[in-house]
């Protein structure tokens, strides 16, 4: 085996190791991006509830949807935002690590279960959210 053969073997091994390292870095970056994407969406929900505190009881306290048309429209808009967020998280739960997966599922199920506004909105627009029912 000549020196060029040895050099070629070293180059192949280096390329394989580099590919493995790049894959691992890419995978970590994808996980971090997914996690921070979920946190960003939840932060937007928090901002919405801070800006419109009158909507929060419809999602966390089981308050039924009633009131004037303006209030109803606002609650429906927030319900759409909440369901969009939930579907995004639900669709990516396999990327979120298993330790956090139970927490995400519990949060989604508990919020959905305690919110007539979400249930009503989802019943009207279920085809928009196919990922949530999987």
PLM feature spans:
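An amphipathic alpha-helical interaction surface
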Residues: 64-134
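Membrane-proximal alpha-helical anchors
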Residues: 1-70
